[in-house]
């Protein structure tokens, strides 16, 4: 099975090389991005909490050498409901690596828009995604620099992973951060306090009359 997956990834090099946009892969320093219902899995293991968001379940139990899988086909509006309208896609990759085992390999990752590949990540070597962050569902790596899309577009992802040596990896959409409640600036608070004092003074004058 491992040989088949590697062959598939290598064949993709020639056909995908013409696409200019390259997906970026960057390590995450610390437990920053965690998979939650607000950041649902696209490729999932049993620990994913997705709510009603569709995902492709990957083989569990560490009994496979790798994966060559396609995500469900999403509408752009479905993606925007997670990441926020007009925002760019950011995916977290949570690595499960067995103790004492070598680093595993992300061989290829693609985004398809309306059925055509528009973004590619390709790696010909091995061991480019060592586990870095402990804890359940935390991203060890980020995939970014995806093409823009419209609400009416369809979006799908293709995930090729090799040298798997532990439990299932997951790939999840990183949701838009929550908007904090508006807090008045100190100057605004001072002006508000002055205004309240003036109102109180007027009421006192009327009471004396």
Q: What annotation goes with each model-predicted range?
A:
Residues 184-202:
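A short, hydrophobic C-terminal helix/tail in secreted or cell-surface proteins
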Residues 189, 206-209:
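Localized chelating/binding microdomains
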Residues 21-182:
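Helix-boundary and membrane-interface capping/anchor signal
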Residues 2-6, 21-23:
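RTX-like calcium-binding, glycine/aspartate-rich low-complexity repeat tracts
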Residues 16-20:
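Sec/Tat signal peptide C-region and signal peptidase I cleavage site
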Residues 14, 202-207:
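Generic secondary-structure boundary signal with a strong preference for alpha-helix termini
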Residues 5-14, 194:
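Sec-dependent N-terminal signal peptides
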Residues 1-4, 204-206:
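Positively charged n-region of N-terminal signal peptides that target proteins for export
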